């Protein structure tokens, strides 16, 4: 049994910490929503063959478009396939790196446990 005045062990300091944690969580949630909107609008370029093939994706890796130079068509199907694959990988890698950087910016300084 607890002594008089001890309650459940939640002093004002603990309540303030809890309130601060909720405030930080709300800030992260709002920031994440803005970040998601920004990532959707981004256009990140991956290219290959000196620009013969360009792949554009959003900041959250959604394909937006593929641009293929007429000169790339003359290279044949196998080479064209390789060029598209390389450009896609480059666009994807740039996009994931951008997303990671933006997420780190969002959560930096928040002192979240486990991050």
Swiss-Prot record:
Gene3D superfamilies: Nucleoid-associated protein YbaB-like domain. This is Nucleoid-associated protein Npun_F0448. Binds to DNA and alters its conformation. May be involved in regulation of gene expression, nucleoid organization and DNA protection. Homodimer. It comes from the Bacteria. InterPro entries: YbaB-like_sf, YbaB/EbfC. One of its GO terms (cellular component) is bacterial nucleoid. GO terms for molecular function: DNA binding. Keywords: Cytoplasm, DNA-binding. It is found in: Cytoplasm, Nucleoid. It comes from Nostoc punctiforme (strain ATCC 29133 / PCC 73102).
């Amino acid at each position: 049994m607890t002594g008089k005045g001890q309650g459940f062990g939640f002093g004002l300091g603990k309540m303030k910490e809890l309130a601060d944690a909720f405030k930080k969580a709300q800030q992260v949630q709002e920031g994440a929503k803005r970040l998601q909107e920004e990532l959707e609008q981004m256009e990140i370029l991956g290219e290959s063959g000196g620009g013969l093939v360009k792949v554009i994706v959003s900041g959250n890796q959604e394909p937006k478009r593929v641009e293929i130079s007429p000169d790339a068509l003359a290279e044949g199907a196998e080479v064209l396939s390789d060029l598209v694959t390389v450009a896609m990988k480059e666009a994807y890698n740039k996009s994931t790196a951008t997303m990671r950087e933006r997420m780190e910016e969002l959560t930096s300084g928040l002192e979240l446990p486990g991050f």
